């Protein structure tokens, strides 16, 4: 019996071509293969992975394999899998359990397949997560696995919040590296990635003309900043909602109106949630929206939009096409919901471009190497002394440096006198840890 489950294994050849194309746009991962391949720093690591099964993730998986790891994989979202990529990885011999359009039950089953079936004792000893679902499964439902896990690397804001919440409650029994807040992840993937992939998803889903429209962006963190910039670049009038006065002031200084959802719910053509919170667009808002208002989310989970209320209270629900649903309200107006309230850029398009994901995934590989290489020396302790850590600044700068040549960038070199003047090494790190980029 094949140790994988994908939509259609015959898509593997198509997926392989897409992976080869992505490799050319992912210089960080390819350089790690060249640098670390001979030394096999992940030999013996058995990584349970739960991250969007895209073409770009396929390049990550094959990089982990090239560095010696044993890997089993599932997607962290029911709609984000690219079936050609999953097929290609399965055909290459990696146990992958992912397909686009999983049910919630199938999603849970897929994740469960990644915590068994490894060589040796069959169990994983490392976790690579995006959103926290795999981490929660292991800690909450498989206590027998906890003593075997040496560490976690977490990809996204939502998953990092989960780690810190667990830590505050004394329920994080192993150390984790917060990949999300590496500068070369959050200030690139979250901002520049969303700046390109949000509109890609919206246009593939609806063919909407953005110019001249009023768009409400809920949240002005790095993701919200990228989304607002993209919509404005297409000619939209952008209104931002925020709870944090610092982010609200940033939005104001960029020229955005900062208001409440209630202030614009009757006028906005497009609503985008970016907060990672819940109950952002609610039953209080839907009845007041204009006809055919588009509502979508680019936060990790489907908690930001009250989709359940729409399904229970709409007079009619029509699926226009996969991931595009039109609800008829009691007042006769319609709401267009994209990706069923889940990640619109992955549900309705193919996610972030390969180049920016190379930044993020290079961080992931370095985090796995860091945790695995230091598993026995006490640097990342277990139990009561476990914590959430960051990659060192030198590695953050290394990730950026690996991508400069691809975009034709050249670095200026400090002289010894200049380095002494600003009190940093000639070759970096160039900024203190508290520096905010």
Swiss-Prot record:
Catalytic reaction annotation: S-adenosyl-L-homocysteine + H2O = L-homocysteine + adenosine
Pfam families the UniProt entry points to: AdoHcyase (PF05221), AdoHcyase_NAD (PF00670)
Gene3D superfamilies in UniProt: Adenosylhomocysteinase-like, NAD(P)-binding Rossmann-like Domain
Gene Ontology BP, a term: one-carbon metabolic process
Location in or out of the cell: Cytoplasm
Annotated metabolic or biological route of this protein: Amino-acid biosynthesis; L-homocysteine biosynthesis; L-homocysteine from S-adenosyl-L-homocysteine: step 1/1
SUPFAM superfamilies: Formate/glycerate dehydrogenase catalytic domain-like, NAD(P)-binding Rossmann-fold domains
InterPro entries registered for this protein in UniProt: Adenosylhomocyst_ase-like_sf (IPR042172), Adenosylhomocysteinase-like (IPR000043), Ado_hCys_hydrolase_NAD-bd (IPR015878), NAD(P)-bd_dom_sf (IPR036291), S-Ado-L-homoCys_hydrolase_CS (IPR020082)
Assigned EC number: 3.13.2.1
Binding locations of substrate: 54, 130, 155, 185, 189
Cofactor, how bound (note): Binds 1 NAD(+) per subunit.
Enzyme class name: hydrolase
Cofactor(s) needed for function: NAD(+)
Keywords: Cytoplasm, Hydrolase, NAD, One-carbon metabolism
GO cellular component: cytosol
Family: Belongs to the adenosylhomocysteinase family.
Function: Adenosylhomocysteine is a competitive inhibitor of S-adenosyl-L-methionine-dependent methyl transferase reactions; therefore adenosylhomocysteinase may play a key role in the control of methylations via regulation of the intracellular concentration of adenosylhomocysteine.
HAMAP family to which the protein is assigned, alphabetical: AdoHcyase
Protein name: Adenosylhomocysteinase
């Amino acid at each position: 019996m094949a140790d994988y489950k994908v939509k259609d294994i015959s898509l593997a050849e198509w997926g392989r071509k897409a992976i080869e194309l992505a490799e050319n746009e992912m210089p960080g991962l390819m350089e790690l293969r060249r640098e670390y391949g001979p030394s096999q720093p992940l030999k013996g690591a058995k990584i349970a992975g739960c991250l969007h099964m895209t073409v770009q993730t396929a390049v990550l998986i094959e990089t982990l394999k090239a560095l010696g790891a044993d890997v089993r994989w599932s997607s962290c979202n029911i709609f984000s899998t690219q079936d050609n990529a999953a097929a290609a990885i399965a055909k290459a011999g990696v146990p992958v359990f992912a397909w686009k359009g999983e049910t919630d039950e199938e999603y849970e089953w897929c994740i469960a397949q990644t915590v068994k079936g490894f060589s040796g004792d069959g169990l994983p000893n490392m976790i690579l997560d995006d959103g926290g679902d795999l981490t929660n499964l292991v800690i909450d439902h498989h206590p027998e696995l906890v003593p075997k896990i040496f560490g976690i690397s977490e990809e996204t804001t939502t998953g990092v919040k989960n780690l810190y919440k667990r830590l505050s409650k004394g329920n994080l029994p192993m150390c984790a590296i917060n990949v999300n807040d590496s500068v070369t992840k959050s200030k690139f993937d979250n901002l520049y990635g969303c700046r390109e992939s949000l509109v890609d998803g919206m246009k593939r889903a609806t063919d909407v003309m953005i110019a001249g429209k009023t768009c409400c962006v809920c949240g002005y963190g790095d993701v919200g900043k990228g989304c607002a910039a993209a919509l404005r670049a297409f000619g939209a009038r952008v209104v931002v909602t925020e709870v944090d006065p610092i982010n609200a002031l940033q939005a104001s200084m960029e020229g955005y109106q900062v208001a409440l959802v209630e202030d614009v719910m009757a006028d906005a053509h497009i609503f985008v949630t970016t907060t990672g919170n819940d109950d952002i667009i609610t039953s209080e808002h839907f009845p007041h929206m204009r006809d055919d208002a588009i509502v979508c989310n680019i936060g990790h989970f489907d908690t930001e939009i009250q989709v359940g209320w729409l399904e229970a209270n709409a007079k009619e629900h029509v699926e226009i096409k996969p991931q595009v649903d039109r609800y008829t309200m009691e007042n006769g107006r319609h709401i267009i919901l994209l990706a069923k309230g889940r990640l619109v850029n992955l549900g309705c398009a193919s996610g972030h471009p390969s180049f920016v994901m190379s930044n993020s995934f290079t961080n992931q590989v370095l985090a796995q190497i860091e945790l695995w290489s230091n598993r026995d020396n006490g640097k990342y302790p277990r139990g009561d002394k476990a914590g959430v850590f960051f990659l060192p600044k030198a590695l953050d700068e290394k990730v950026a440096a690996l991508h400069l040549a691809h975009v034709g960038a050249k670095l200026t070199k400090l002289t010894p006198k200049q380095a002494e003047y600003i009190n940093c090494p000639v070759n970096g790190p160039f900024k203190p840890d508290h520096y905010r980029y």
